[in-house]
């Protein structure tokens, strides 16, 4: 059965609180209740080794803890809250409003790994020798398959960016947690691309408006498309940041899209409809070269618009 995007569950239904752990029913992941369980920032290699030590000791009765991959940690993010950028009413404690490592390496610069800022939900990459926090997670159902899709990463690297054998590393490339969309994720019909993973429909031409625009102009362009029934439809819109990020493949770069994507003229930066909770003058942007998630100043014409159709989605399942 193909997993789909859905809206968020109510928070009182989403999180199941144990003594020291929290199960996220929306994703099938178990997190430590204490988001600073490991106390201090660590390098990426140190973090991977620390997780191995947790598993050896059977921490909280489990031997399959891991550093979350990028999609797993991203699944906790709320773009409506800050400090921390977690859902309102979440049950976690000691959440550090700074960067947390993921187990996913940057495909273009493999001496860097992805991390997410829990103060504001930015998704960036940094040198693996840097020191950041770690939040252990494990999958609670279907073996290694959470309700999320895999990141796409299938290769492992050391801190210098050299390819290594994945066995025993605990990296995203070894664990490959989640569902894999085997083939034919995208199909085309009259210059429109349907994404079977998300039920969203994108334009094949990822640069249909030819030039970068400011944020308000992106909405005006989508409205104009609807008035003129562009491509036979009148429900085009600017995608939210979670929908844009759903296209990213961690094994790819320039652009960071799945190998079988069918899109043309993909640009480096795209506006989302999601306003920054830190500063309403900024909106979230997807950086398509590597797949980073950052912000752009709304009045500046620096980013492109890639219209989408379909029921607005908030998280993958």
Can you describe what each PLM-predicted range is?
Residues 1-66, 70-237, 242-317:
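Glycine-aromatic-enriched surface loops/turns that form tight recognition elements
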